[in-house]
Amino acid sequence: MADGKDSLRLAPDEFKQLEVLRNRFHQLTHSLNSLFNDIQRSQPLPSQESLTASAAILQKSLETIQKLADENSDLFQRIVVHPSTNFPGRTQEHILLQLLRKKLEPEVESWVEDARSVAKASGLDPSKLASSQQRSNDYDDDDDDYRDEEEDAPSDPFNEQWADMFQVSMDSIRDYLMNQANEPYTIAEREMGIENVRTGLKRSLEEEDSEEEDEDEDEDEDRSLATAGLGNINAANLFHPEHVLWLASRGNMKVPKNVDLEAIRKREKPRGRPAPAQ
């Protein structure tokens, strides 16, 4: 095999990156072998803390390798492995075949197929991922002047899927906060009929909700009148920290009546105790 950076026609910095990646792969292989030996020899199996620590080390190694591969993708795609005339092909044939292999090994191929099956079962189309990755890499030379710095970074084919999942999650959370959080009955209870739900209460939950809404409206009017009596206050000052905190936690600004507004509580005159009867 051709040795050194001269045979590969690499710059010193490029050869250094290649050496760093080789060392990272060596560390990853060592960590995998160490974990495999620990599991094989330990009776009983290693503790949960030990397995978690090993998994964290492996994940960190994989992230580092992925980052190096992304940062030097052009370099690694340009490098071509070719045997030199003095390579011991007879005694090191297995290494030569491993380096020159263009297809995945059967075991690795089975892992890839399993991953594709899991992705398909989850609603992800592997062919769509591959096509999106191909489209992201197919840039014309004229497009380079119009690309942002973020577009120059290596693209992830799962970005669109993660964005879709994030949007669905946010929509579900928003629907729950706005429509379901204050709902006294579940969807299943609504479907079977709320008259068949045993709440253990003498009054209907629907009636209680309507009464609470009326009380909230009355209290809001009282608060607005109390606030108006304190001077000329614009509409922006009618929002208190309690409203903001409630909006952040529940998705609406309907503060319950049992929550006192600190600003109004401080401004209102405390009610004194009645004088004792003579």
Curated annotation (Swiss-Prot):
One cellular component term from this protein's GO annotations in UniProt: core mediator complex
Which residues, if any, are the signal sequence?
none
Q: Which UniProt keywords apply?
A: Activator, Nucleus, Transcription, Transcription regulation
Superkingdom, taxonomy of origin: Eukaryota
Q: Which family does it belong to?
A: Belongs to the Mediator complex subunit 8 family.
Q: Which gene encodes it?
A: med-8
Q: State what protein this is by name.
A: Mediator of RNA polymerase II transcription subunit 8
Q: Spell out the subcellular localization from the entry.
A: Nucleus
- Region annotated Disordered sits at 122-161, 201-224, 257-278
Q: What does this protein do?
A: Component of the Mediator complex, a coactivator involved in the regulated transcription of nearly all RNA polymerase II-dependent genes. Mediator functions as a bridge to convey information from gene-specific regulatory proteins to the basal RNA polymerase II transcription machinery. Mediator is recruited to promoters by direct interactions with regulatory proteins and serves as a scaffold for the assembly of a functional preinitiation complex with RNA polymerase II and the general transcription factors.
Listed GO biological process terms = regulation of transcription by RNA polymerase II
Upper classification of the organism: Eukaryota, Fungi, Dikarya, Ascomycota, Pezizomycotina
Q: Which stretches does UniProt call biased (Acidic residues)?
A: 139-154, 206-222
The record's annotation in Gene3D superfamilies points to: 1.20.58.1710, 6.10.250.2610
Q: Which terms does the record give in the GO molecular function aspect?
A: RNA polymerase II cis-regulatory region sequence-specific DNA binding; transcription coregulator activity
| Quaternary context | Component of the Mediator complex.
Matching InterPro entries, A to Z? Answer: Mediatior_Med8_fun/met
